Protein backbone atom coordinates (compact mmCIF):
# COMPACT_ATOMS: atom_id res chain seq x y z
CA UNK A 1 0.00 0.00 0.00
CA UNK A 2 2.83 2.47 0.87
CA UNK A 3 4.58 2.91 -2.47
CA UNK A 4 7.77 4.56 -1.18
CA UNK A 5 8.15 2.42 1.96
CA UNK A 6 11.87 1.72 1.45
CA UNK A 7 12.67 5.41 1.09
CA UNK A 8 10.98 6.50 4.33
CA UNK A 9 11.36 3.42 6.60
CA UNK A 10 14.79 4.55 7.79
CA UNK A 11 14.51 3.67 11.50
CA UNK A 12 13.08 0.75 13.45
CA UNK A 13 10.32 2.93 14.90
CA UNK A 14 9.41 4.30 11.49
CA UNK A 15 9.22 0.76 10.13
CA UNK A 16 6.89 -0.28 12.93
CA UNK A 17 4.58 2.71 12.41
CA UNK A 18 4.55 2.37 8.62
CA UNK A 19 3.85 -1.36 8.87
CA UNK A 20 0.87 -0.64 11.13
CA UNK A 21 -0.44 1.99 8.69
CA UNK A 22 -0.11 -0.47 5.83
CA UNK A 23 -1.82 -3.26 7.76
CA UNK A 24 -4.65 -0.99 8.89
CA UNK A 25 -5.43 0.33 5.40
CA UNK A 26 -5.71 -3.25 4.15
CA UNK A 27 -7.80 -4.50 7.11
CA UNK A 28 -10.22 -1.54 6.98
CA UNK A 29 -10.93 -1.93 3.26
CA UNK A 30 -14.51 -0.75 2.42
CA UNK A 31 -15.31 -3.91 0.45
CA UNK A 32 -14.74 -6.05 3.53
CA UNK A 33 -16.42 -3.51 5.82
CA UNK A 34 -19.75 -3.53 4.00
CA UNK A 35 -19.77 -7.32 3.59
CA UNK A 36 -19.10 -7.84 7.28
CA UNK A 37 -21.71 -5.26 8.31
CA UNK A 38 -24.47 -6.81 6.20
CA UNK A 39 -23.73 -10.32 7.46
CA UNK A 40 -23.28 -9.33 11.11
CA UNK A 41 -26.55 -7.35 11.17
CA UNK A 42 -28.47 -9.86 9.02
CA UNK A 43 -29.68 -7.12 6.66
CA UNK A 44 -32.11 -8.35 4.01
CA UNK A 45 -32.78 -6.72 0.64
CA UNK A 46 -36.33 -7.95 0.09
CA UNK A 47 -37.45 -6.23 -3.08
CA UNK A 48 -37.95 -7.40 -6.65
CA UNK A 49 -36.66 -4.07 -7.93
CA UNK A 50 -33.43 -2.81 -6.41
CA UNK A 51 -31.85 0.44 -7.54
CA UNK A 52 -28.38 1.51 -6.39
CA UNK A 53 -26.59 4.83 -6.51
CA UNK A 54 -23.35 5.81 -4.81
CA UNK A 55 -20.93 8.70 -4.56
CA UNK A 56 -17.64 9.20 -2.77
CA UNK A 57 -14.07 7.99 -2.67
CA UNK A 58 -15.10 4.55 -1.43
CA UNK A 59 -18.13 4.08 -3.72
CA UNK A 60 -16.56 1.48 -6.00
CA UNK A 61 -15.20 -0.71 -3.21
CA UNK A 62 -18.49 -0.46 -1.34
CA UNK A 63 -20.32 -1.60 -4.47
CA UNK A 64 -17.93 -4.54 -4.86
CA UNK A 65 -18.77 -5.60 -1.30
CA UNK A 66 -22.56 -5.32 -1.56
CA UNK A 67 -22.84 -6.70 -5.10
CA UNK A 68 -23.26 -10.42 -4.21
CA UNK A 69 -26.19 -9.59 -1.91
CA UNK A 70 -28.27 -7.65 -4.46
CA UNK A 71 -27.26 -8.72 -7.97
CA UNK A 72 -30.24 -11.05 -8.53
CA UNK A 73 -32.84 -8.27 -8.16
CA UNK A 74 -30.73 -5.32 -9.32
CA UNK A 75 -32.35 -3.27 -12.08
CA UNK A 76 -30.11 -0.20 -12.03
CA UNK A 77 -26.70 0.67 -10.56
CA UNK A 78 -24.58 3.79 -11.00
CA UNK A 79 -21.87 5.44 -8.91
CA UNK A 80 -19.75 8.60 -9.07
CA UNK A 81 -16.05 8.34 -8.19
CA UNK A 82 -13.09 10.77 -8.45
CA UNK A 83 -12.04 11.36 -12.05
CA UNK A 84 -8.56 9.93 -11.45
CA UNK A 85 -9.60 6.80 -9.53
CA UNK A 86 -8.83 3.44 -11.09
CA UNK A 87 -11.69 0.94 -11.05
CA UNK A 88 -12.55 -2.46 -12.48
CA UNK A 89 -15.58 -3.05 -14.69
CA UNK A 90 -18.88 -4.71 -13.82
CA UNK A 91 -21.27 -5.14 -16.73
CA UNK A 92 -24.27 -3.97 -14.72
CA UNK A 93 -22.57 -0.97 -13.11
CA UNK A 94 -22.40 2.46 -14.69
CA UNK A 95 -19.32 4.28 -13.37
CA UNK A 96 -19.39 8.07 -13.68
CA UNK A 97 -16.71 10.59 -12.75
CA UNK A 98 -16.62 13.77 -10.70
CA UNK A 99 -14.10 16.31 -9.43
CA UNK A 100 -12.60 16.62 -5.93
CA UNK A 101 -11.93 18.51 -3.66
CA UNK A 102 -13.82 21.19 -5.59
CA UNK A 103 -17.00 20.36 -7.45
CA UNK A 104 -17.39 21.20 -11.13
CA UNK A 105 -19.35 20.71 -14.33
CA UNK A 106 -18.27 17.06 -14.51
CA UNK A 107 -19.79 16.35 -11.08
CA UNK A 108 -23.05 18.05 -12.06
CA UNK A 109 -23.44 16.22 -15.38
CA UNK A 110 -22.61 12.90 -13.69
CA UNK A 111 -25.10 13.57 -10.88
CA UNK A 112 -27.90 14.36 -13.31
CA UNK A 113 -27.03 11.27 -15.35
CA UNK A 114 -26.93 9.00 -12.29
CA UNK A 115 -30.32 10.18 -11.01
CA UNK A 116 -31.89 9.82 -14.46
CA UNK A 117 -31.98 6.04 -13.91
CA UNK A 118 -34.31 6.38 -10.92
CA UNK A 119 -37.61 6.72 -12.74
CA UNK A 120 -41.12 5.72 -11.70
CA UNK A 121 -40.12 4.64 -8.20
CA UNK A 122 -42.90 3.18 -6.06
CA UNK A 123 -43.31 2.09 -2.43
CA UNK A 124 -42.27 -1.49 -3.25
CA UNK A 125 -38.94 -0.46 -4.74
CA UNK A 126 -35.69 -0.38 -2.78
CA UNK A 127 -33.03 2.26 -3.41
CA UNK A 128 -29.59 1.59 -1.93
CA UNK A 129 -27.36 4.65 -1.49
CA UNK A 130 -23.62 4.26 -0.89
CA UNK A 131 -22.11 7.38 0.69
CA UNK A 132 -18.49 8.11 1.58
CA UNK A 133 -16.08 11.01 1.96
CA UNK A 134 -15.73 13.24 -1.06
CA UNK A 135 -19.42 12.87 -1.81
CA UNK A 136 -20.05 16.58 -1.29
CA UNK A 137 -18.02 17.54 -4.35
CA UNK A 138 -18.68 14.44 -6.48
CA UNK A 139 -22.48 14.56 -6.13
CA UNK A 140 -23.89 17.99 -6.85
CA UNK A 141 -26.77 19.71 -8.63
CA UNK A 142 -27.04 23.47 -7.95
CA UNK A 143 -30.22 25.09 -6.68
CA UNK A 144 -32.17 27.30 -9.08
CA UNK A 145 -30.42 30.64 -9.47
CA UNK A 146 -27.05 29.15 -8.46
CA UNK A 147 -24.44 27.89 -10.92
CA UNK A 148 -21.62 25.46 -10.36
CA UNK A 149 -18.98 28.22 -10.42
CA UNK A 150 -20.79 29.89 -7.50
CA UNK A 151 -20.57 26.67 -5.47
CA UNK A 152 -16.96 26.07 -6.46
CA UNK A 153 -15.82 29.61 -5.66
CA UNK A 154 -17.73 29.82 -2.38
CA UNK A 155 -16.30 26.45 -1.27
CA UNK A 156 -12.75 27.44 -2.22
CA UNK A 157 -13.03 30.80 -0.46
CA UNK A 158 -14.23 29.14 2.74
CA UNK A 159 -11.60 26.37 2.62
CA UNK A 160 -8.76 28.82 1.97
CA UNK A 161 -9.90 30.82 5.01
CA UNK A 162 -9.69 27.72 7.20
CA UNK A 163 -13.36 26.81 7.66
CA UNK A 164 -14.17 23.45 9.19
CA UNK A 165 -16.24 20.75 7.49
CA UNK A 166 -19.35 21.62 9.54
CA UNK A 167 -19.30 25.24 8.39
CA UNK A 168 -18.57 24.28 4.79
CA UNK A 169 -21.35 21.72 4.54
CA UNK A 170 -23.85 24.04 6.23
CA UNK A 171 -23.37 26.50 3.39
CA UNK A 172 -23.14 23.80 0.71
CA UNK A 173 -26.59 22.49 1.63
CA UNK A 174 -28.06 25.94 0.96
CA UNK A 175 -26.66 25.97 -2.57
CA UNK A 176 -27.62 22.45 -3.62
CA UNK A 177 -30.70 20.57 -4.86
CA UNK A 178 -29.43 17.24 -3.45
CA UNK A 179 -27.85 18.09 -0.10
CA UNK A 180 -29.42 18.70 3.30
CA UNK A 181 -32.03 15.95 2.95
CA UNK A 182 -33.14 16.98 -0.52
CA UNK A 183 -32.12 13.67 -2.13
CA UNK A 184 -34.67 11.94 0.12
CA UNK A 185 -37.47 13.88 -1.57
CA UNK A 186 -36.30 12.63 -4.98
CA UNK A 187 -36.34 8.97 -3.91
CA UNK A 188 -39.79 9.04 -2.27
CA UNK A 189 -41.94 6.88 -2.05
CA UNK A 190 -39.36 4.07 -2.41
CA UNK A 191 -37.71 2.50 0.62
CA UNK A 192 -34.14 3.69 1.06
CA UNK A 193 -31.20 1.97 2.75
CA UNK A 194 -27.96 3.93 2.92
CA UNK A 195 -24.55 2.53 3.85
CA UNK A 196 -22.12 5.20 4.95
CA UNK A 197 -18.40 5.51 5.60
CA UNK A 198 -17.92 8.47 7.93
CA UNK A 199 -15.16 11.00 7.47
CA UNK A 200 -16.41 13.59 9.97
CA UNK A 201 -16.19 14.35 13.67
CA UNK A 202 -18.84 12.60 15.80
CA UNK A 203 -20.07 10.73 12.67
CA UNK A 204 -22.78 13.35 12.13
CA UNK A 205 -25.09 12.16 9.32
CA UNK A 206 -26.01 15.74 8.47
CA UNK A 207 -22.37 16.51 7.67
CA UNK A 208 -21.20 13.39 5.79
CA UNK A 209 -21.45 14.34 2.08
CA UNK A 210 -23.58 17.28 3.30
CA UNK A 211 -26.38 14.99 4.51
CA UNK A 212 -28.27 14.16 1.29
CA UNK A 213 -30.70 11.87 3.16
CA UNK A 214 -30.75 13.67 6.51
CA UNK A 215 -33.08 16.37 7.76
CA UNK A 216 -30.94 19.34 8.70
CA UNK A 217 -32.31 21.88 11.16
CA UNK A 218 -29.77 24.68 11.19
CA UNK A 219 -30.24 27.61 13.50
CA UNK A 220 -30.61 30.70 11.33
CA UNK A 221 -28.21 32.52 13.67
CA UNK A 222 -25.47 29.91 13.09
CA UNK A 223 -25.94 30.00 9.34
CA UNK A 224 -25.84 33.79 9.10
CA UNK A 225 -22.80 33.95 11.37
CA UNK A 226 -20.95 31.42 9.18
CA UNK A 227 -21.84 33.26 5.96
CA UNK A 228 -20.71 36.60 7.39
CA UNK A 229 -17.50 35.11 8.81
CA UNK A 230 -16.24 33.70 5.51
CA UNK A 231 -18.25 35.36 2.73
CA UNK A 232 -19.47 38.72 3.99
CA UNK A 233 -22.94 39.69 2.77
CA UNK A 234 -23.34 37.09 0.01
CA UNK A 235 -26.90 37.25 -1.30
CA UNK A 236 -26.52 34.12 -3.45
CA UNK A 237 -27.09 31.88 -0.43
CA UNK A 238 -30.76 31.12 0.17
CA UNK A 239 -32.37 30.08 3.41
CA UNK A 240 -32.86 26.39 4.09
CA UNK A 241 -36.26 25.12 2.95
CA UNK A 242 -38.12 22.89 5.37
CA UNK A 243 -38.67 19.27 4.27
CA UNK A 244 -41.68 17.30 5.53
CA UNK A 245 -41.09 14.29 7.79
CA UNK A 246 -42.84 11.96 5.35
CA UNK A 247 -39.80 11.94 3.06
CA UNK A 248 -37.59 10.48 5.80
CA UNK A 249 -39.95 7.85 7.21
CA UNK A 250 -38.72 5.09 4.88
CA UNK A 251 -35.02 6.00 5.06
CA UNK A 252 -32.58 3.83 7.03
CA UNK A 253 -28.96 4.90 7.36
CA UNK A 254 -26.09 2.73 8.61
CA UNK A 255 -22.54 3.86 9.34
CA UNK A 256 -20.37 0.87 8.44
CA UNK A 257 -16.89 2.33 8.97
CA UNK A 258 -15.52 5.33 10.84
CA UNK A 259 -12.31 6.91 12.10
CA UNK A 260 -12.71 5.28 15.51
CA UNK A 261 -12.61 1.83 13.88
CA UNK A 262 -9.18 2.65 12.43
CA UNK A 263 -7.90 3.84 15.81
CA UNK A 264 -9.23 0.77 17.63
CA UNK A 265 -7.55 -1.50 15.09
CA UNK A 266 -4.24 0.35 15.43
CA UNK A 267 -4.48 0.23 19.23
CA UNK A 268 -5.09 -3.53 19.21
CA UNK A 269 -2.11 -4.12 16.93
CA UNK A 270 0.49 -1.83 18.46
CA UNK A 271 1.63 -4.54 20.91
CA UNK A 272 3.10 -1.96 23.27
CA UNK A 273 1.98 0.48 25.92
CA UNK A 274 -0.23 2.84 23.90
CA UNK A 275 -2.65 5.74 24.39
CA UNK A 276 -5.70 6.14 22.16
CA UNK A 277 -6.56 9.85 22.21
CA UNK A 278 -9.80 9.48 20.26
CA UNK A 279 -11.15 10.55 16.90
CA UNK A 280 -12.56 14.03 17.53
CA UNK A 281 -9.51 16.23 16.99
CA UNK A 282 -10.09 19.28 14.81
CA UNK A 283 -8.94 22.84 14.34
CA UNK A 284 -6.04 24.59 12.68
CA UNK A 285 -2.86 22.52 12.28
CA UNK A 286 -0.80 25.26 13.88
CA UNK A 287 -2.90 25.11 17.04
CA UNK A 288 -3.24 21.32 17.06
CA UNK A 289 0.53 20.78 16.84
CA UNK A 290 0.99 22.83 20.03
CA UNK A 291 -1.94 21.17 21.78
CA UNK A 292 -0.60 17.74 20.89
CA UNK A 293 2.82 18.60 22.33
CA UNK A 294 1.23 19.59 25.63
CA UNK A 295 -0.94 16.46 25.76
CA UNK A 296 2.03 14.18 25.10
CA UNK A 297 4.21 15.96 27.66
CA UNK A 298 1.52 15.53 30.31
CA UNK A 299 1.08 11.84 29.49
CA UNK A 300 4.83 11.27 29.70
CA UNK A 301 5.06 13.07 33.05
CA UNK A 302 2.61 10.47 34.36
CA UNK A 303 3.96 7.37 32.59
CA UNK A 304 7.68 8.16 32.77
CA UNK A 305 8.39 5.77 29.90
CA UNK A 306 8.10 5.79 26.09
CA UNK A 307 4.59 5.27 24.73
CA UNK A 308 2.82 5.01 21.40
CA UNK A 309 -0.12 7.30 20.75
CA UNK A 310 -2.84 7.58 18.13
CA UNK A 311 -5.61 10.05 17.35
CA UNK A 312 -7.89 10.98 14.49
CA UNK A 313 -9.99 13.76 13.06
CA UNK A 314 -9.55 16.48 10.49
CA UNK A 315 -7.60 19.71 10.75
CA UNK A 316 -7.60 22.85 8.63
CA UNK A 317 -4.87 24.96 7.06
CA UNK A 318 -4.83 28.68 6.28
CA UNK A 319 -3.61 28.65 2.68
CA UNK A 320 -1.41 31.66 1.94
CA UNK A 321 1.13 30.24 -0.52
CA UNK A 322 1.03 28.30 -3.77
CA UNK A 323 3.14 25.28 -2.86
CA UNK A 324 2.36 21.57 -2.87
CA UNK A 325 1.25 20.10 0.43
CA UNK A 326 -1.58 19.31 2.79
CA UNK A 327 -2.76 19.47 6.40
CA UNK A 328 -1.14 16.17 7.44
CA UNK A 329 2.27 17.09 6.07
CA UNK A 330 2.05 20.55 7.62
CA UNK A 331 1.11 19.03 10.97
CA UNK A 332 4.19 16.81 11.27
CA UNK A 333 6.47 19.67 10.20
CA UNK A 334 4.90 22.02 12.73
CA UNK A 335 5.22 19.33 15.39
CA UNK A 336 8.94 19.09 14.60
CA UNK A 337 9.31 22.87 14.54
CA UNK A 338 7.72 23.21 18.00
CA UNK A 339 9.64 20.36 19.63
CA UNK A 340 12.40 20.83 22.18
CA UNK A 341 15.77 19.08 22.36
CA UNK A 342 14.56 16.95 25.27
CA UNK A 343 11.71 15.40 23.28
CA UNK A 344 12.23 12.10 21.46
CA UNK A 345 9.55 11.21 18.95
CA UNK A 346 8.45 9.74 15.67
CA UNK A 347 5.15 11.03 14.32
CA UNK A 348 3.16 10.20 11.19
CA UNK A 349 -0.03 11.85 10.00
CA UNK A 350 -1.93 10.73 6.91
CA UNK A 351 -5.22 11.02 5.08
CA UNK A 352 -6.94 7.65 4.82
CA UNK A 353 -8.01 8.47 1.26
CA UNK A 354 -4.36 8.57 0.19
CA UNK A 355 -4.45 12.21 -0.89
CA UNK A 356 -3.30 15.06 1.35
CA UNK A 357 -4.29 18.48 0.08
CA UNK A 358 -2.78 19.47 -3.26
CA UNK A 359 0.06 16.96 -3.30
CA UNK A 360 0.80 13.40 -4.44
CA UNK A 361 1.31 12.27 -0.83
CA UNK A 362 -1.09 10.79 1.72
CA UNK A 363 0.74 12.49 4.57
CA UNK A 364 4.11 12.75 6.27
CA UNK A 365 6.41 11.17 8.84
CA UNK A 366 9.24 12.81 10.81
CA UNK A 367 11.37 11.95 13.84
CA UNK A 368 13.65 13.69 16.29
CA UNK A 369 16.77 11.91 14.97
CA UNK A 370 16.56 13.44 11.49
CA UNK A 371 16.55 17.23 11.58
CA UNK A 372 14.93 19.09 8.70
CA UNK A 373 16.16 22.57 7.75
CA UNK A 374 14.18 25.54 6.39
CA UNK A 375 10.83 24.41 7.83
CA UNK A 376 9.51 27.97 8.22
CA UNK A 377 10.37 28.87 4.64
CA UNK A 378 8.39 25.94 3.25
CA UNK A 379 5.47 26.34 5.66
CA UNK A 380 5.10 30.00 4.72
CA UNK A 381 4.40 29.01 1.13
CA UNK A 382 2.38 25.88 2.05
CA UNK A 383 4.98 23.69 0.35
CA UNK A 384 5.28 20.88 2.90
CA UNK A 385 5.37 18.09 0.30
CA UNK A 386 8.49 19.36 -1.47
CA UNK A 387 10.34 19.65 1.84
CA UNK A 388 9.31 16.20 3.06
CA UNK A 389 9.92 14.35 -0.21
CA UNK A 390 13.59 15.34 -0.19
CA UNK A 391 13.94 14.50 3.52
CA UNK A 392 12.52 10.94 3.42
CA UNK A 393 9.27 12.12 5.00
CA UNK A 394 6.42 12.02 2.44
CA UNK A 395 4.10 9.00 2.71
CA UNK A 396 2.86 8.00 -0.75
CA UNK A 397 0.07 5.45 -1.15
CA UNK A 398 -1.96 6.64 -4.13
CA UNK A 399 -5.75 6.68 -3.80
CA UNK A 400 -6.87 4.05 -1.29
CA UNK A 401 -10.55 3.89 -2.23
CA UNK A 402 -11.40 4.75 1.38
CA UNK A 403 -11.90 7.84 3.52
CA UNK A 404 -12.42 8.14 7.28
CA UNK A 405 -10.55 11.44 7.56
CA UNK A 406 -7.03 11.60 9.07
CA UNK A 407 -4.98 9.43 11.41
CA UNK A 408 -1.98 10.45 13.53
CA UNK A 409 0.25 7.80 15.08
CA UNK A 410 3.59 8.08 16.84
CA UNK A 411 6.03 7.27 19.63
CA UNK A 412 6.95 9.84 22.28
CA UNK A 413 9.11 10.30 25.37
CA UNK A 414 11.46 12.79 27.01
CA UNK A 415 15.16 12.37 27.70
Swiss-Prot record:
UniProt xrefs under Gene3D superfamilies: Glycerate kinase, MOFRL-like N-terminal domain, MOFRL domain
Taxonomic placement: Archaea, Methanobacteriati, Thermoplasmatota, Thermoplasmata, Thermoplasmatales
Primary gene name: gck
Protein name: Glycerate 2-kinase
Enzyme Commission identifier(s): 2.7.1.165
Recorded family membership: Belongs to the glycerate kinase type-1 family.
Organism: Picrophilus torridus (strain ATCC 700027 / DSM 9790 / JCM 10055 / NBRC 100828 / KAW 2/3)
Function in brief: Catalyzes the ATP-dependent phosphorylation of D-glycerate to 2-phosphoglycerate. It can also partially utilize GTP, CTP or UTP as phosphate donor.
Keyword Nucleotide-binding: yes
SUPFAM superfamilies: GckA/TtuD-like
Amino acid sequence: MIENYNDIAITDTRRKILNIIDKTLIAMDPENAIKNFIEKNNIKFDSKRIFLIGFGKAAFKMYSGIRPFILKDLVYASIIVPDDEKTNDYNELRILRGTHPFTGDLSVSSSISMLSGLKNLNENDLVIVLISGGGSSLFEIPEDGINIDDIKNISKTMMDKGCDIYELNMVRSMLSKVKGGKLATMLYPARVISFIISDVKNDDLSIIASGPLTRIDYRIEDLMETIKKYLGNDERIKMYRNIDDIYFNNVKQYIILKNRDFLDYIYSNINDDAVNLGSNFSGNVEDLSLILHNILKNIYSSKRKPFYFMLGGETTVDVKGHGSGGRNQELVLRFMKNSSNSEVYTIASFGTDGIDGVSPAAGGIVDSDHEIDNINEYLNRNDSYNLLIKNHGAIITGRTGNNVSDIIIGLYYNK
